From Swiss-Prot:
GO terms for molecular function: structural constituent of ribosome. It holds the Pfam family Ribosomal_S2. This is Small ribosomal subunit protein uS2c. PANTHER family: 30S RIBOSOMAL PROTEIN S2 PROKARYOTIC AND ORGANELLAR, SMALL RIBOSOMAL SUBUNIT PROTEIN US2M. HAMAP family: Ribosomal_uS2_B (MF_00291_B). Belongs to the universal ribosomal protein uS2 family. It comes from Phalaenopsis aphrodite subsp. formosana. GO terms for cellular component: chloroplast; mitochondrial small ribosomal subunit.
Length: 236
């Protein structure tokens, strides 16, 4: 896997607030190698290290995308939800941005059953079948469809387990990370100063609370995935 240039700029990262961690008493000592200083009671991460790991992550996703691999992006906290959806759609990735249903990956057969039910209901709605049902039944099925859309809408075209999972918030998405570890699925994870850097395959030290920080990281990863997809299509 060759190294490429991903236009990762330290000044741009600083402007996005990527270096701001949590208050110093809410930290994981394992993050010590990634922290450069303390400022006004807050840990500051080393942006040079962040840039290196982000570049490695971009190399990895480019290489995977150029070989036709499938990606899943997960970020369910409110401030990340829209960013996750737009990034995933741009890069033609699957995504989960509302709620992670436990076992979504480890109990894949159950997820497949839910997805089939979702597809069937969507088809029935498009053909107008729901409108021909008694009002109460139609209302119940429409509510079910709305729930399935919220939880499964981003993975509706997923036909198997992903090859790489990108996780926006380690603490929030710990269940996802554990499922990936169990299944041996490689992970790329944003890690703030209260996280464990050893859990993901590539951990990117970054502020996982600021929208600008999340957006910048996802933008770089998505750009690399899109370049990889283009390379795959040309090879095909």
């Amino acid at each position: 896997m060759g190294r490429r240039y991903w236009n990762i700029n330290l000044e741009e990262m600083m402007e996005a607030g990527i270096h701001f961690g949590h208050v110093t008493n809410k930290w994981n000592p394992r993050m010590a190698p990634y922290i450069s200083s303390k400022r006004k009671g807050i840990h500051i991460t080393n942006l040079t290290i962040t840039a290196r790991f982000l570049s490695e992550a971009c190399d990895l996703v480019f290489d995977a995308a150029s070989r036709g691999k499938r990606f899943l992006i997960v970020g369910t906290k409110k401030k990340a939800a829209d960013l996750v959806a737009s990034a995933a759609i741009k890069a033609r990735c699957h995504y989960v941005n509302k709620k992670w249903l436990g076992g979504m990956l480890t109990n894949w057969s159950t997820t497949e059953t839910r997805l089939q039910k979702f597809r069937d209901l969507r088809a029935e709605q498009k053909m107008g079948k729901l409108n021909r049902l008694p009002k109460g039944d139609a209302a119940m099925l429409k509510r079910k469809l709305s729930t399935l859309q919220a939880y499964l809408g981003g993975i509706k075209y997923m036909t198997g387990l992903p090859d790489i999972v990108i996780i926006v918030d380690q603490q929030e998405e710990y269940t996802v990370l554990r499922e990936c570890v169990i299944l041996g699925i490689p992970t790329i994870c944003l890690i703030d100063t209260n996280c464990d850097p050893d859990l993901a395959d590539i951990s990117i030290p970054a502020n996982d609370d600021a929208i600008a920080s999340i957006r910048l990281i996802l933008t770089k990863l998505v750009s690399a995935i899109c370049e990889g997809h283009s390379s795959y299509i040309k090879k095909g």
